[in-house]
């Protein structure tokens, strides 16, 4: 699972490498060195600069985008078939959002992981989702393919949501 606020997810008193390697070792049989190498490789895949620095940093020394990438890397290192992402980009500016969305999609495609994303951001949903379910107060208002919900919404609540869609900036596969 990828939690909404990675800053709350990561222990501020422990270095990233200690938390990351411990998480890997709890779920898979490996040495600390093997865990460190897996963590370093996954962080590099998410294009974190200077992975050695990130691994040796405390969470409070990292930006919000870096902490979110660490959380995504930790979750994806488990090789999940299904990943639940709760507002994975909510605390990020739109440029970093676009980068994180692209990296999550690249990992999804590379690893064959299905992602269920919970978000209020219809822009992020339209970029990441094949299917979209729109809910209001715990009630399903609309469900359909991305194209149906984004371009041909039937429900008034969905239409209102789409009027406030922030535009993602940055490069995403030349789109």
Where in this protein do the model-derived segments appear?
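Hydrophobic anchor residue at the start of the ABC signature
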Residues: 20, 72, 83, 96, ...
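Helical segment within the ABC ATPase nucleotide-binding domain
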Residues: 98-111, 123
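Conserved ABC ATPase signature
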Residues: 57-62, 66
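A short, surface-exposed alpha-helical micro-motif characterized by mixed small hydrophobic
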Residues: 125-127
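A short, proline-enriched helix->beta-strand linker immediately N-terminal to the Walker B motif
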Residues: 77-81
């Amino acid at each position: 699972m990828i939690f909404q606020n990675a800053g709350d997810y990561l222990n501020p008193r422990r270095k990233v490498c200690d938390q990351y390697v411990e998480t890997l070792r709890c779920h898979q049989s490996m040495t600390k060195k093997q865990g460190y190498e897996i963590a370093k490789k996954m962080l590099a895949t998410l294009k974190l600069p200077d992975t050695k620095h990130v691994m040796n940093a405390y969470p409070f020394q990292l930006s919000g985008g870096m902490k979110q990438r660490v959380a995504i890397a930790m979750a994806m290192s488990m090789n999940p078939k299904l990943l639940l992402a709760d507002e994975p980009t909510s605390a990020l500016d739109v440029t970093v959002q676009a980068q994180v969305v692209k990296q999550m999609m690249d990992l999804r495609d590379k690893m064959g992981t299905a992602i269920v994303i919970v978000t209020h951001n219809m822009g992020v949903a339209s970029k990441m989702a094949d299917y979209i379910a729109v809910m209001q107060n715990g009630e399903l208002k609309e469900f359909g393919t991305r194209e149906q919900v984004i371009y041909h919404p039937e429900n008034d609540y969905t239409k209102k949501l789409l009027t406030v869609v922030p535009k993602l900036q940055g490069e995403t596969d030349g789109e």
